Amino acid sequence: SEELSFSFTKFKTDQKNLILQRDALITPTGKLQLTTVENGKPAAYSLGRALYSTPIHIWDKSTGDEASFATFFSFVISDAPNPSTAATDGLAFFLAPADTQPQSAGGYLGLFEKDSSYNSSNQIVAVEFDTYYNSAWDPQTNPHIGIDVNTIKSKKVSSWGFKNGNVATVLITYQPSSKSLVASLVYPSGQTSDKTSYIISANVDLKATVPEWVRIGFSATTGQTDNYIETHDILSWSFKSKLPATKN
């Protein structure tokens, strides 16, 4: 079988095997900062993405087999300290063609081009952690976790009790036998008595959606003015995929 795995417990400023796009950078403290922060304040109209440099063999044309995968990461989103700001827009984990480039900012999360955001030829699967209600395509549950298949309008959505500034841990798995993509988010700190875990799943046919080889990574965006901003920091990330051996 073909296996690939990696683990970043933190990130190095000269991190090999990561492709940083647009505003993404690694901070001196080892965080993968996807969107710009200036003087401690998130910047408006920021878009940043980070991809694992090695493409992943996610399905095999000769056998028709798909890979199973699991990815685990932790992140923090912090709204600006000013109470008049709204947390905007969110971050996503995604799989896309190997030559994937940043797309439209704002509510499109850097994943979709404004004019083709409903086009099934996008070849992208994403799990979004969306803090802002875009009335044109989002359900009214805000903030929410969504599973996106080729379009910014999520195939499946679950409400999410976003906790400003708290570390969230996420596990995303894909099982080819059931074509089941499952994402869970937990706030492990137990600082509040509120609900702290969320789960969402959807049937996704990876073979019908993305190319045989994909790149995986994160994308995040902020809003268009200083009233619609937040930070997007990935603290750790691990991934493992397994594709069954080629049939002779």
Curated annotation (Swiss-Prot):
Glycans are attached at N119. Keywords: Calcium, Glycoprotein, Lectin, Manganese, Metal-binding. The keyword Calcium applies. Ca(2+) binds at D130, Y132, N134, D138. Pfam families: Lectin_legB. Coiled coil: none annotated. GO terms for molecular function: carbohydrate binding; metal ion binding. Mn(2+) binds at E128, D130, D138, H144. InterPro entries: ConA-like_dom_sf, L-lectin, Lectin_LegA_CS, Lectin_legB_Mn/Ca_BS, Legume_lectin_dom, Leguminous_Lectin. SUPFAM superfamilies: Concanavalin A-like lectins/glucanases (SSF49899). It comes from the Eukaryota. Belongs to the leguminous lectin family. This is 2-acetamido-2-deoxy-D-galactose-binding seed lectin 2. It comes from Cytisus scoparius (Scotch broom).
